[in-house]
Each structure stands twice: as C-alpha cells, then as structure tokens.
Amino acid sequence: MAAHSIFTTTSTTNSFLYPISSSSSSPNINSSFLGVSLNVNAKFGQSLTLYAVTTPKPLTVFAATKKAVAVLKGNSNVEGVVTLSQDDDGPTTVNVRITGLAPGLHGFHLHEYGDTTNGCMSTGAHFNPNKLTHGAPGDEIRHAGDLGNIVANADGVAEVTLVDNQIPLTGPNSVVGRALVVHELEDDLGKGGHELSLTTGNAGGRLACGVVGLTPI
C-alpha cells in the first residue's frame, strides 16, 4: 500500500482531509476553499494544515427608533394629533395635543381595533392582551391601553407627554393599527366603584379617535 501524507483545511463548520500521493516527492496542490485560492507545495512525509479565510460580509443596520402618528377626529369639534416614538425595546413616548375639549380631565385610552367605519364606537374595547381589569397606568393590574387622563386647560387644549412600556410599536403586542380614543369624562382608574369602573373607568362617551400608523423616522 502506498504511503500518504495528509493535509487538512478547517473552517468554522467543516474540516477536509486530502491525501498526498507518494508518487510525487514534491506535489503541487492547487485548490480553492470558500472562495480562497490555495497554492501549496508539500513534501512527502509532511502534514500540512491549511486554514480557509472568509471575506467579511457587509452588515445591514436597522433603524433602532420607530415612530407613529394618530390623527384624532370625531363628530364634535374635538380633534388632535398624537405622535408615538420608541427607541430599541424601551418604553414608548406619547406626545398628545388635543383641542376642543371641555376644561378638565378626560380619559385617554388605546383601543383594540383600528376600525372607524362606525366612528369611534367600532374601535372596540381597551387594548387588553393580558386579559386584566381596568386600572391606572402605574398599576400592575391594568389594560395595556389604559393611559389614564389628560387635562384640558381653560381653552379646551390638552397637551401632555406620556411614557408607557405596554404599548410597543413592534412585536406581537404592537399598537400599530389600533386606535387612540379621548373620552368625554374623567377616567376613575378602576377605583370609582361604578359598574363600569373595572372595564372602561366610567369615562363616558368617545369624543374623538384616530388609528395609529407608522411614519418615516
């Protein structure tokens, strides 16, 4: 049986063994591994280890910030614009400006559907993926869509910035395509003792609503 020398090539996933025949005292091996050309002079009786090197691929960088907007309208003169932004997997910042409100507190919620074919009534109930009862934004037990109250000044304008970690713009519980709704009355945050306290916060009618849609960064 003829004697052989062995050389190997190693990558992150495979090792290859190739015999060097004894018929040549100094065989010249020309080959290519993973797109890298090799030219190796091997002497009989020696063992060679060759390592293939891959060319780095360009990285694809995705924008870490997501932004969205909702334009609120209704059957009255109440209207507004709400912008939402989220960095990476952090909380979502919500900037609210609504006009035409009666001065005072108004419940402000994210509802489960982005359907406004029947006005704000067709937006469904509060967004509640965890099937909990209604509460305040800071409560452990709350709907994800429970954003508390906004306050309108004497001119009927409510301007506020909210930060919440249960209304992401991506992922299985993304709020994109759902609706923001401003209500007629104050939200009792689930603590008012009314029969509707643990479902709607007894916040009354729906004055204006808008579907959350993604916007350019």
Swiss-Prot record:
Sites where the protein binds Cu cation:
109, 111, 126, 183
Q: What is its EC number?
A: 1.15.1.1
Spell out the subcellular localization from the entry.
Plastid, Chloroplast
Q: Name one GO molecular function term.
A: superoxide dismutase activity
Disulfide pairings: 120-209
Quote the record's binding site residues for Zn(2+): 126, 134, 143, 146
Transit peptide boundaries: 1-63
- Keywords in UniProt for this one? Antioxidant, Chloroplast, Copper, Disulfide bond, Metal-binding, Oxidoreductase, Plastid, Transit peptide, Zinc
Gene Ontology BP term (one): removal of superoxide radicals
Q: Which reaction does it catalyse?
A: 2 superoxide + 2 H(+) = H2O2 + O2
Q: Give the record's cofactor note, including how many are bound.
A: Binds 1 copper ion per subunit. Binds 1 zinc ion per subunit.
Matching InterPro entries, A to Z? SOD-like_Cu/Zn_dom_sf, SOD_Cu/Zn_/chaperone, SOD_Cu/Zn_BS, SOD_Cu_Zn_dom
Domain of life (superkingdom): Eukaryota
Identify one Pfam family in the record. Sod_Cu
Query: How the protein assembles, per its UniProt entry?
Result: Homotetramer.
What exactly does this protein do?
Destroys radicals which are normally produced within the cells and which are toxic to biological systems.
* Protein name from the UniProt record: Superoxide dismutase [Cu-Zn], chloroplastic
Q: Which organism is it from?
A: Solanum lycopersicum
> Which gene name belongs to this protein?
SODCP.2
